[in-house]
């Protein structure tokens, strides 16, 4: 596959609950984020997703939708996966 680098659009977004998790339970944060990104890579061909190594960007992700894919649909898919982790339960 050949991709014209000028046509690639990369988005950055933050998931607040994951940023909060990093502040309180950093080891759990890393475990969940690594598993989440791996799962999304294995089960979706609609986008590429990754995290930043800079820990000041905990909770931030970059995503590159496949050509013709809508970023709103991509974000909905990602949030469905995040919701499945039931992260809110760790704060009760």
UniProtKB/Swiss-Prot annotation:
Keywords: Endonuclease, Host-virus interaction, Hydrolase, Inhibition of host innate immune response by virus, Nuclease, Restriction-modification system evasion by virus, Viral immunoevasion
Keyword Nuclease in annotation: yes
Pfam family, one: DM_Arn
Molecular function (Gene Ontology), one example: endonuclease activity
Gene Ontology biological-process annotations: symbiont-mediated evasion of host restriction-modification system; symbiont-mediated suppression of host innate immune response
Gene3D superfamilies xref list: 3.30.70.2770
Protein role: Pays a role in the inhibition of the host restriction-modification system. Strongly inhibits the host mcrA endonuclease that cleaves 5-methyl and 5-hydroxymethylcytosines at the specific DNA sequence C(me)CGG.
Name listed for the protein in its UniProt record: Anti-restriction endonuclease
Encoding gene, per UniProt annotation: arn
